[in-house]
Amino acid sequence: NGFIAIIGCYAQLQSKEISEIEGVDLVIGAKEKFRLAEYINDIYKNNIDKINSCDISKVNFFKEAYSLGKNRTRAFLKVQDGCDYKCSYCTIPMARGVSRSDTIENIILNVHKIAKEGIKEVVITGVNTGDFGKRINSNKNDENNFLQLIHKLDKIETIDRFRISSIEPNLLNDNIIEFVSKSKKFVPHFHIPLQSGSDKILKKMKRRYLTNLFLNRVNTIKKYMPDSCIGVDVIVGFPGESEDEFTKTYNFLSVLDISYLHVFKYSERSNTEALNYPKVIPELIRKKRSNILRQLSLKKRKYFYQSQIGKKLNILFESENKNGFIEGYTENYIKVRDYWNPNKMNTIQKRVLSSIDKMGYCRI
């Protein structure tokens, strides 16, 4: 007697296709997903059809959201939604709509609500987080931009840490980097989408930067914060990515002073420009290149962890017993494991990292 509702990005993009799947009771898109309970009630009363998607251009409001769960030490706070970029491989603008943001005042109110739940760390999230400040029906950003937002958040005493989830390299300017380096609350951890180490491929992807800018961003971060953690997104197997172009990506990533990679195989998406690009890369080659970069990521992470051995760092311990161990993260996103002690749950402790165990965790 279960009721199956499909909501979110996929439902917005492929509502008709999903509705034909046996057992699906309801499909609702981006604008209507926040009325899920209301739609379920109407379905039971036979008042509406099972499909309700919309023209994504009509999604013209910001819906606040943050995560709070049992035994959580971190909360994820959405400050921005949608994207105005037109990357040739991406369906996010079609699924999530235009870039739009919450107000700084409301964000601060939500941070205080989160703090009352005992949360120690807030992760600032968005579809294009660095574009914060964009308002509907406006051709320019609000005077309250991302830099001003993090300045305001840094003054909140009830939260110990703020972490930026991901930020585009062209939006990660020197002012933001320098501010984080001096911040009381924002931790030295950046996750920056690269997607390719080949300028030719970046241009085909219609990204808003080339490798020189990306290298500059990484070097600037390390100049101000030598112990910072830098994660990078990369896509392999994009149409036209020859062996030479992939080698350029590998070599570029090899010399970058970064800490880990998130590697994605390119996958075709309907209604994207890249879907019609020639020189499609076979799936086996995509998989091979993905594995190569995942191995590089393991080496990068191990090297970064080793560079922190002997240093005293602040560890936020998670509130969960994992087979006799407790895990946590340092401010610069090193995963630490220690023997279970309930008194450590949801506490921040300054400890010296002593070694790396066989599972890849740092020990204290």
Describe the residue ranges of each PLM region.
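A structural micro-motif
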Residues: G2, D25, I159-D160, S228, ...
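Short, glycine- and charge-enriched coil/turn segments that flank and shape catalytic ligand pockets
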Residues: D42-I51, K134-Q148, N212, K322-G324, ...
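Conserved SAM/AdoMet-binding glycine-rich loop
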Residues: L13, K116-E243
